[in-house]
Swiss-Prot record:
UniProt subcellular location: Periplasm; Bacterial flagellum basal body
InterPro entries assigned to the protein according to its UniProt record, in alphabetical order: Flag_FlgI (IPR001782)
This protein's name: Flagellar P-ring protein
Any Gene Ontology biological process: bacterial-type flagellum-dependent cell motility
The entry's keywords: Bacterial flagellum, Periplasm, Signal
Highest rank taxon of the organism: Bacteria
Subunit structure and binding partners: The basal body constitutes a major portion of the flagellar organelle and consists of four rings (L,P,S, and M) mounted on a central rod.
Job of this protein: Assembles around the rod to form the L-ring and probably protects the motor/basal body from shearing forces during rotation.
Family classification: Belongs to the FlgI family.
Signal peptide: 1-21
HAMAP family: FlgI (MF_00416)
Length: 367
């Protein structure tokens, strides 16, 4: 009996060391409380000769004519305006939850034509619409571009992106979105990641603090909470719930591979079983040169001939069979994979093969 209690205490101690507490607000979000996307089309003026080439972007000229006509200025028909300080842009913003009329939000401005840079430009008044084609905000202001560039004599240098910028507090909310917050007696908490264990732990924590039946786990991602009626009561109720702490168990072992950049990221739960790996590299080098053959005598009547010369080199480095020991923690996994001497691109194929062979104890996600 005493041995059983001692073993149970050791197991509970190990579980406690593996788990750590996090607030419910860091693990969940309130269903329905989210941002909405806004988009608009506008003009940027005041560019230092880096705007759209209007002969190649007719929509810029058309937009400018429409804007001038609204201001009472008529451009004669057939006029070919050669402008370099105007650019057509797309403006995007995020409409925050519970936004009120008169509140300001940030906007992102991106070039739509062939403008070289938006640095120093000013966005003219641009209506921002939602998916329902209703105008919810108006954007205008000076654009802040984070990049820099210079060109002279056919040479150019550029740091970061010049065709996009940001206007802090550049849009004013003109229309409010209706909200259903406070209308019902239940609110759903959505977990950031689907996890049956975590959903049940959040449910138990709320029931212990607010009484049995206050929360119910609907599925692996949704926890339904009974709340008092009224906005102010629900705000106070959610504030208390979101600050509750829940013991978080270890996450699922996962390896994420970015197929575009070749980066590999794994969490600390990844483990390896013993296996043997052989990786061979195949490299092909193609070298093409143009040889110019001229006649020996200047006036002999011969012709200058350009003949291409191509060399192809094929090399294959055979990879020897290397043993990978079983690894119980992340540091051991990293050391075992580094011992293979594989590049990140090779490592992607190796990890896929390890999972197929049952040696990689983790979920493999390719993005």
């Amino acid at each position: 009996m005493y041995v059983f209690k001692a073993l149970a205490g050791i197991v509970l101690a190990l579980v406690a060391t593996l788990a750590h507490a996090e607030r419910i607000r860091d693990l969940t979000s309130v269903q329905g409380v989210r941002e909405n996307s806004l988009i608009g089309y506008g003009l940027v003026v005041g560019l230092d000769g880096t705007g759209d080439q209007t002969t190649q972007t007719p929509f810029t000229t058309q937009t400018l004519n429409n804007m001038l006509s609204q201001l009472g200025i008529t451009v004669p028909t057939g006029t070919n305006m050669q402008l370099k300080n105007v650019a057509a842009v797309m403006v995007t913003a995020s409409y925050p939850p519970f936004a009120r009329q008169g509140q300001t939000i940030d906007v992102v401005v991106s070039s739509m034509g062939n403008a070289k840079s938006l640095r120093g430009g000013t966005l003219l008044m641009t209506p921002l619409k939602g998916v329902d084609s209703q105008v919810y905000a108006l954007a205008q202001g000076n654009i802040l571009v984070g990049g820099a560039g210079a060109s002279a004599g056919g040479s150019s240098v550029q740091v970061n992106q010049l065709n996009g910028g940001r206007i802090t507090n550049g849009a004013i909310i003109e229309r409010e979105l209706p909200t259903q917050f406070g209308a019902g007696n239940t609110i759903n908490l959505q977990l950031n990641d689907e996890d049956f264990t975590m959903a049940q732990q959040i449910t138990d924590a709320i029931n212990r603090a607010r009484g049995y039946g206050s929360a119910t786990a609907l599925d692996a991602r949704t926890v339904q909470v009974r709340v008092p009626s009224g906005n102010s009561s629900q705000v106070r109720f959610l504030a208390d719930i979101q600050n509750m702490e829940v013991n978080v168990t270890p996450q699922d072992a996962k390896v994420v591979i970015n197929s575009r950049t070749g980066s590999v990221v794994m969490n600390r739960e990844v483990t390896l079983d013993s296996c043997a790996v052989a990786q061979g590299n195949l490299s092909v080098t193609v070298n093409r040169q143009l040889n110019v053959n001229q006649p020996n005598t200047p006036f002999g009547g011969g012709q200058t001939v350009v003949t291409p010369q191509t060399q192809i080199d094929l090399r294959q480095s055979g990879g020897s069979l290397q043993s990978v020991r079983s690894s119980a923690n992340l540091n051991s996994v990293v050391r075992a994979l580094n011992a293979l001497g594989a590049t990140p691109m090779d490592l992607m194929s190796i990890l896929q093969s390890m999972q197929s062979a049952g040696c990689l104890r983790a979920k493999l996600e390719i993005i």
